[in-house]
Swiss-Prot record:
Function: The alpha subunit is responsible for the aldol cleavage of indoleglycerol phosphate to indole and glyceraldehyde 3-phosphate.
Keyword presence, Lyase: yes
Species assigned in the record: Saccharolobus solfataricus (strain ATCC 35092 / DSM 1617 / JCM 11322 / P2) (Sulfolobus solfataricus)
Name of the protein described by the UniProt record: Tryptophan synthase alpha chain
Catalytic reactions on record: (1S,2R)-1-C-(indol-3-yl)glycerol 3-phosphate + L-serine = D-glyceraldehyde 3-phosphate + L-tryptophan + H2O
EC code(s) of this entry: 4.2.1.20
InterPro entries documented for this protein: Aldolase_TIM (IPR013785), RibuloseP-bd_barrel (IPR011060), Trp_synthase_alpha_AS (IPR018204), Trp_synthase_suA (IPR002028)
Pfam entry (one): Trp_syntA
SS bonds (residue pairs): none
Domain of life: Archaea
Length: 245
């Protein structure tokens, strides 16, 4: 059976509080999230937009590891940790061991191609030698040849961020950006980093994206209307994805 379009759901670990976070994650999976990205607050959130930065501030000081263990017991879909390599590069082996110990499936470092491109092959090897997935983040500023290369080594999917930071608009259309890379990518192409409106989603899917990654809009919805309302958004996005086979 052909797999439908993928819904990748992001949430900052522990946001807005531990219980609400758990409720949202479980509800998201029950309503169609295929993969979870859990954000580990970094020291400097260079490539995150204001909404996600604010969510990091709200959970500062939280002991994330027991929380990850709890979530892992509750859901069966793949879970990827999302955090900055800059914070862990000097203790990468130890960090990856912790990721493995709490039974996460892999890691996504948004700064890998931007700030550590010379170490790409080495870091990819270290991650995979631990038995973890390395999900690679790329963007319109990455050269075509590099997008093509990393699409072949990225695990699960290639994450293509269409905006310079999460939730910040850009002048070029989503369709144009995806048309440029679709033929370069030998992998599942997941589009995110600022998708929020229904028209953005539909544009991405009709241009050939294999799925979407959404986070900012869920954080905003939890802030405004609570967890149940954010779970309803997951359900809504799942229904849109299911229109495209």
């Amino acid at each position: 059976m052909e797999m439908g379009k993928m819904l990748v759901v992001y949430m900052t670990l522990g946001y807005p509080n531990v219980q609400s976070f758990k409720d949202f994650i479980i509800g998201a999976v029950e309503n169609g999230a295929d993969i979870l990205e859990l954000g580990i607050p970094p020291k400097y959130a260079k490539y995150d937009g204001p909404v996600i930065r604010k969510s990091y501030d709200k959970v500062k000081g939280l002991d994330i590891w027991p929380l990850i263990e709890d979530i892992r017991k509750d859901v069966g879909v793949p879970i990827i940790a999302l955090t900055y390599l800059e914070d862990w590069v000097d203790q990468l082996e130890n960090f990856l061991n912790m990721i493995k110990d709490v039974k996460l499936d892999g890691i996504l470092f948004p700064d890998l191609l931007i700030d550590y491109i010379d170490d790409l092959d080495k870091i990819d090897g270290i991650i995979k030698n631990k038995g973890l997935k390395n999900v690679i983040f790329t963007s319109p500023s990455v050269p075509d040849l590099l997008i093509h290369k990393v699409s072949k080594i990225s695990d699960l999917f290639l994450y293509y961020g269409v905006r310079p930071t999460t939730g910040v608009p850009i002048p070029v259309s989503v369709k144009q950006l995806i048309n440029r890379v679709r033929n370069l990518v030998e992998n599942k192409l997941i589009v995110g980093f600022g998708l929020s409106s229904e028209s953005d989603l539909r544009d991405a899917l009709s241009a050939g994206a294999d799925g979407i990654a959404i986070g900012t809009v869920f954080i905003e919805e939890i802030e405004r209307n609570g967890v149940k309302s954010a779970i309803n958004l997951v359900k809504k996005f799942r229904a849109i994805l299911d229109e495209y086979k």
